[in-house]
From Swiss-Prot:
It comes from Halorhodospira halophila (strain DSM 244 / SL1). Catalyzes the 2'-O-methylation at nucleotide C2498 in 23S rRNA. It catalyses: cytidine(2498) in 23S rRNA + S-adenosyl-L-methionine = 2'-O-methylcytidine(2498) in 23S rRNA + S-adenosyl-L-homocysteine + H(+). NCBIfam families: PRK11760.1. Monomer. PANTHER family: RIBOSOMAL RNA LARGE SUBUNIT METHYLTRANSFERASE M, RIBOSOMAL RNA METHYLTRANSFERASE FTSJ DOMAIN-CONTAINING PROTEIN. Keywords: Cytoplasm, Methyltransferase, rRNA processing, S-adenosyl-L-methionine, Transferase. This is Ribosomal RNA large subunit methyltransferase M. The active site is at 290 (proton acceptor). One of its GO terms (biological process) is methylation. One of its GO terms (molecular function) is S-adenosylmethionine-dependent methyltransferase activity. Coiled coil: none annotated. InterPro entries: RlmM_FDX, RlmM_THUMP-like, RNA_MeTrfase_FtsJ_dom, rRNA_MeTrfase_M, SAM-dependent_MTases_sf.
Length: 339
């Protein structure tokens, strides 16, 4: 099946950054095309007129993506589902439909429509034989408004609109726990995720959201911060709280995990993470980089390049729970994966 480009979700305000990243990725794959990106729309469409686009690669500023198979405009209010089913190419085959909206001020009011439309759409697709609900693939329909949608096809990974369904734990000391939880699901392969008995260092730990999640997973944690931890963590024998500067702390022995949510210039955090990996103080790291207002994509690429000079593999994403920042996962290549 020919793919006419990519449908990409992003955080509102980062459309041009994602468009630049997508254009560069397409050029690296010898795919010719152009992007349509409207400010504050929370999505970007890359068009490949030759119909030779592969499935979209992992892009830092894309929350979710799919291969574009068509754009439908002027959909009727009555019989909308049947019109979509009739317009889809037969080569779509079997896939489970996801009805999505942009995560923007204009797009969020469509959430109710998307929920209610999913049932009629599935019925129409089944009736026409376009799809039979294959759980391994997704037919993604992005609605900028109720009469206009982009249709795409992609693998099962991720969440509708790139928005994870995570609940805030009742006893967690801060909402930052959701950021680390999302990072573990999205960036870290299952056989590389933290597991009981490992040891972690949390730089910039207070009040302790990331430390709390690591303890919930059975790790012991050295929490580094001059500020106080939540009382439950301060009394936890599995947490060692050291009141010192995150940039000066050095571990006594190699640790399994380094996590860092320190607010500092991205270049400074990248240098610190690079040092930890090069000196083999940590096997793996998850850390945030605060983004500058200007040239964020260049800043991210330079930071990832610096981390990779250590021989570590690294990739990053602007998560749903990130704001003006990205989250990076890096692991030394010599580190042994859990079987």
């Amino acid at each position: 099946m020919e793919l006419q480009g990519w449908i990409l979700h992003c955080r509102a305000g980062y459309e041009q950054t994602l468009a630049s990243e997508a254009t560069m990725a397409a050029h690296e794959r010898d795919v010719h095309g152009y992007c349509r990106a409207r400010a504050q729309s929370a999505y970007v469409v890359f068009h490949a007129p030759a119909g030779d686009a592969p499935l979209p690669p992992q892009l830092v500023f894309a929350r979710a993506g799919a291969g574009l198979i068509g754009e439908l405009q002027g959909l009727p209010e009555g019989g909308r589902a049947e019109a979509i089913a009739a317009a889809l190419p037969p080569a779509v085959g079997s896939a489970t439909p996801w009805v999505e909206h942009p995560d923007s001020d204009a797009g969020r009011p469509l959430a109710r429509f998307c929920r209610r439309f999913t049932g009629p759409l599935r019925h129409a697709l089944t009736q026409t034989g376009v799809t039979s609900g294959d759980p391994q693939r997704r037919l993604r329909l992005l609605f900028p408004d109720s009469r206009h949608c982009f249709a795409g096809i992609g693998p099962r990974e991720g969440w509708p609109s790139g928005i994870p369904r995570l609940r805030m734990p009742r006893n967690a000391p801060s909402r930052s726990v959701l950021k680390l939880e999302e990072a573990l699901h999205r960036l870290v392969p299952e056989n590389e995720r933290p597991y009981p008995g490992e040891h972690a260092v949390d730089l910039g730990a207070a009040p302790g959201g990331w430390t709390w999640l690591l303890r919930e997973r059975g790790l012991t944690v050295t929490a580094i911060d001059n500020g106080p931890l939540a009382p439950a963590l301060a009394d936890d024998p599995g947490v060692e709280h050291q009141r010192t500067d995150a940039f000066r702390f050095r571990p006594r022995t190699e640790v399994d995990w380094l996590v860092c949510d320190v607010v500092d210039r991205p270049q400074g955090i990248a240098r610190l993470m690079t040092q930890w990996l090069r000196e083999e103080w940590a096997r793996a790291a998850i850390f945030n980089l605060k983004l500058p207002m200007r040239r964020p994509l260049e800043t991210v690429r330079q930071a990832l390049d610096a981390v990779r000079t250590t021989g570590a593999r690294a990739h990053a994403a602007q998560l749903y729970h990130d704001r003006e920042e990205i989250t990076v996962y890096a692991r030394r290549m010599a580190s042994r994966n859990r079987p």
